[in-house]
UniProtKB/Swiss-Prot annotation:
Biological source species: Vibrio parahaemolyticus serotype O3:K6 (strain RIMD 2210633)
Keyword annotations: Metal-binding, Pyrimidine biosynthesis, Zinc
SUPFAM superfamilies membership: Aspartate carbamoyltransferase, Regulatory-chain, C-terminal domain (SSF57825), Aspartate carbamoyltransferase, Regulatory-chain, N-terminal domain (SSF54893)
Any one GO cellular component localisation term in the record: aspartate carbamoyltransferase complex
Gene label: pyrI
Subunit structure: Contains catalytic and regulatory chains.
One Pfam family from the record: PyrI
Keyword Metal-binding listed: yes
Protein's name according to its UniProt entry: Aspartate carbamoyltransferase regulatory chain
GO terms for MF: metal ion binding
Function: Involved in allosteric regulation of aspartate carbamoyltransferase.
Names of the cofactor(s): Zn(2+)
Domain of life (superkingdom): Bacteria
Family of the protein in this entry: Belongs to the PyrI family.
Length: 153
């Protein structure tokens, strides 16, 4: 007897599917790319069952294609997510997620004494991994923070 499976989230004709986002991170990714203000249809799956993660989040954005730079920002939130570009219901491209070397003007420095809070400068962080933990180092105050501390703000 064949095992019957059914999609829990409807397929899209054209656009981007971001899958294997850790549970509870999907909304942050939605806001990172400003998708919640898009006029395109966005399908969100939260806390979906996953054999690899236990639970996962999923985003499907119609008629929007994420570029390599955006995919590298996504790697800060969900380094093992998959990004598929869909055309006519078929996967035409898979983007590999790689941590960016640096990230500018996306996050605020958690250090309240950092000059970036009082001066008209763009925030800037060097991104690196230490013992499999993602770390960000502020360009201005040179303090090092875990990914979670920076992305929670």
């Amino acid at each position: 007897m064949a095992k019957e499976t059914q999609l829990q989230v409807e397929a899209i004709k054209n656009g981007t599917v971001i899958d294997h986002i850790p549970a509870q991170i999907g909304i942050k990714v939605l806001k990172l790319f400003d998708m919640h203000n898009s006029s395109q249809r966005v399908t969100i799956g939260l806390n979906l069952p996953s054999s690899a993660l236990g639970h996962k989040d999923l985003l499907k954005i119609e008629n929007v294609f994420i570029n390599e730079e955006q995919a590298s920002k996504l790697a800060l939130y969900a380094p093992h997510a998959t990004v598929n570009q869909i055309e006519n219901y078929e996967v035409v491209k898979k983007l590999a997620l790689e941590l960016p070397e640096k990230i500018n003007n996306v996050f605020e420095c958690p250090n309240s004494n950092c000059i970036s809070h009082n001066e008209p400068v763009e925030s800037s962080f060097k991104v690196f991994e230490k013992k499999e933990e993602i770390r960000l180092k502020c360009k201005y105050c040179e303090k090092v923070f875990s990914r979670e501390i920076v992305t929670e703000r």
